[in-house]
Amino acid sequence: MNTKHIEILYEDAHILVCIKPHGVPTQSRRAGTPDMESLVKNHIYQSAPEKGQPYLAVIHRLDQPVKGILVFAKTPFAAKELNRQLQSHGFGKYYRALADGHPSQKEGTLEDYLIKDGRANTSRVCASGTAGAKLARLHYAVVEQGPFLFDQAPNDDAPRTELDIRLDTGRHHQIRVQLAHMGCPIAGD
């Protein structure tokens, strides 16, 4: 992926909103690995190289396998304001997921305590009193149910559910962990 292939939804002097494709990390610590932060920074630089290296702040992240909308701040003021809005729920985090199985309710709220294992890059549901546990809350609504085919299982007609998801919190692997705990893991996960 190069900067010509970034799908920009909105850009002004302060922010840039774009689509992050499946498989591209939001940020990467590995040199030579393309990531959205580097691609967007290169896009900004190429559009005005006379301004030098641009300022860019990632406002939120999406997991590498996830496709979705990313918001970047192009100025320190915008970064501060967008982070304030995110913390005060001035704008939300909305997702659409394809899950295996069918939830028992058409809509609901999941509240669990999650603990992160940084070395294994995993998270799991745990008891509320567990040291390091953090509250995770999401709301879901069924969009459609049926056998949906997707790239990782093109001949599989297992029951699946398309869900709209709104996060109140943004925990590590929150959606995949909470949906799996509910009995409806992300399809192909």
In which residue ranges do the predicted regions lie?
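RNA pseudouridine synthases
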Residues: M1-D189
